[in-house]
Amino acid sequence: MKTKLFLSQLVALVVVAAIFYASYGATNALASACANVPEIYFAWERAVPFWAWSIVPYWSLNLLYALGFFLCRNSRELARYVTQLLAAQIIATLFFIVFPLQMSWEKPAVSGLSGFLFSSLAAFDLPFNQAPSLHIILCVVVGAFYLRKARAVWLKVALVAWFALIGLSVLTTYQHHFIDIPTGLAAGCFVLLVRPMDGEPLRFAMATETARYKWAALYLGLAFLTLFAAITGAKIWSSWALWLSWASLSFALVACGYAFFGAGVFAKNGQGRHVAAAKALLFPYLCIARLNAFFWLRGRRLSDEILPGLYLGSVKQAGKFDAVLDCAAEFERPDGAQIYASLPMLDMITPSVDELKRGADELEWLVKTTLCVGENLPQMAAKLGSNFSAKAGYANGRDLKFRRQADARANLQTSGAANESEIGAAKQIFANSNGRTAETNGKKLLVCCALGYGRSASVLLAWMVIYRGFGFDDALNLLKSRREKIAVSSSLRERIERLAVRTSEI
């Protein structure tokens, strides 16, 4: 078995290396045949020193790249590593062909080991293939591979320091200009996002709902607007304006999420955390999402009790509850909840029937797990794990496919509001159906999204109808009487009622 794996590793290395040198050489040749190849750099880069010794860490990436093949523990890990490297090569090659750039600065004469390494590099390299820096892309991909394997803290620190030195060396060896570095970092993070080493890869699936394309168009428009502002600002004001292109990239990725990838573009894992690659790429959008939540929630209650022990509210309150069902894709969970389930959904989109079913199932399990007398919550959390449901969230990398076309988003109007007798009756229904309520054990469960008005309310409505026998209007009236600003789409009733029928037939 080990011999077979070793042969697979060796063959993979030979094939990937051949593709690397063939494609890299081809794009260099194409660029050298062009009459005028542009060069982009900042004036301050003239002050960057040439450190001949930094060719050693620069070259070390080649060794680490190759060694990684033989550190893969099985064929699955080897396949993931190979596909990451090939994805990096494809992305870089496409940019080298479409946007050829050069680095024209002459290197000082160097002797000794550094001179030998520079001469070896010059044997196959030309001053082209600049942005995004393939060296930086591979630094991200290969670095993530090694960090994943490191266990000791000191080793992780040493690896981060060494790979940072590799990244710096592209400047101090006069191999690249600065602009090649952030573009390379972005491309490397994108590779890790679409093809992670753990979990399922990002799934491509065309959205079937008009609402998702409308939001995709909005974010794509914001992407173009911020890109225009970045370029224009750099021309008439300062090169610092180019950092707006980071926001442009984040908006473009969110647009792709609405149109193709679903909530998986946020890569929120079962512990309620965004993976590092997604966090880096989407950072500007995530900051804006938090500002937006702050704006809409200012002066308002962050959560409200709907039924005894069962609350609806913002994910910002999640740390104060014993158990949480989190429906927000764009927010990370606060620390605190002992039992946590993640079911990420896109904002401003009506949950699909499948999402509603999974959300209702998760909530029912949380109710039975949390809102009952005599259970030791920490022990229960330990038995279940921090994400007890194998069905929930991005932990298993599943992108939910939306199957029906949604109507325009609007508040669903129903006649009347729940009066006190209806609320009392609702409490009794909950108490009778659950047997032992949270009133007797003091435990609290939160169903949440960004604001606690849309996605989480939809899931709670589905649970009340399917598992607690509420009529849709009664459930909605109860929610609106307890938490203002509830906003659900006009198509939600049909989806929940269809789900209730489907559930009753099982």
Predicted regions and their residues:
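A phosphate-binding catalytic loop at a beta-strand-loop-alpha-helix junction
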Residues: 375, 379-382, 443-461
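N-terminal transmembrane-helix/juxtamembrane module of multi-pass inner/ER membrane proteins
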Residues: 1-64, 108-109, 118, 262-274
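PTP/DSP superfamily signal
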Residues: 199-294, 364-370, 438-444, 458-506
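Membrane-interface helix caps and helix-loop-helix hairpins in membrane proteins
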Residues: 124-129, 170-179
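Hydrophobic alpha-helical transmembrane segments
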Residues: 55-66, 83, 136-141
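Cysteine-based protein phosphatase catalytic domain of the PTP/DSP
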Residues: 114-121, 295-371, 431, 435-447, ...
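Membrane-interface loops
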Residues: 28-46, 71-166, 190-194, 202, ...
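Alpha-helical transmembrane segments that form the membrane-embedded catalytic/substrate-binding core
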Residues: 138-139, 176-196
